[in-house]
């Protein structure tokens, strides 16, 4: 697919405005990408602000540039990369300040390099119906999500499905963007948190002064864990007949106290 730097179709361009009787120039995402690339390389942040303000005034408000209803047109400006998490949403606006743009461009260096190589892939590959690299990223993400879902639903007696790589996945791996690895880690984290065991809590009693010196304790008895009494036993001895070995006809007579169990003479 080769990119046309000229006019885009009206239905794909959100800036069909008229100023002074003339149509505002209609931009393609690739044409804007090449301009944004020059601004990044030359670090012309003030010129970039002037360019956005002059050409897209309807998206500028209070030194803020909004991306509402712009489609893929400005994805290369902030190098939008879809996230595996549903909590991370697409950026809706940026501040038109030189310090902010310098920080934004510095934080998205690798993402913009990824966009550059994906644009080159789209341009040299026939049959790729995409106008923005984020469409390829979404395709790779969707393919990986389907693979992980099929992996979760597989039966034990059926071979697991094979992961089918996209032709451009190697470009993603080059910039450490591996949706398969990220989604599998997310799956493992989800299963491990769902099967967590409850930790057993041992309640230990510490022998402190409050336990030892009980005011209401019985003075005639020791502490509970000994199980003995201070009073002497009033023995009540009994004699029983017991066979000491199995199959032995000899029986022994044992004399013991039935109260404390002490053997008698």
Curated annotation (Swiss-Prot):
Record InterPro entries: Baculo_LEF5_C, Baculo_LEF5_N
Superkingdom field: Viruses
Primary localization class, coarse: host cell
Signal sequence extent: none
Biological process (GO), any one: regulation of DNA-templated transcription
Presence of keyword Transcription regulation: yes
GO cellular component: host cell nucleus
Protein localization: Host nucleus
Keywords: Host nucleus, Transcription, Transcription regulation
Subunit architecture: Interacts (via N-terminus) with itself.
Protein family (similarity comment): Belongs to the baculoviridae LEF-5 family.
Function: Plays a role in the transcription of late viral genes. May function as an transcriptional initiation factor.
Protein name (Swiss-Prot/TrEMBL): Late expression factor 5
Organism field: Autographa californica nuclear polyhedrosis virus
Organism phylogeny: Viruses, Viruses incertae sedis, Naldaviricetes, Lefavirales, Baculoviridae
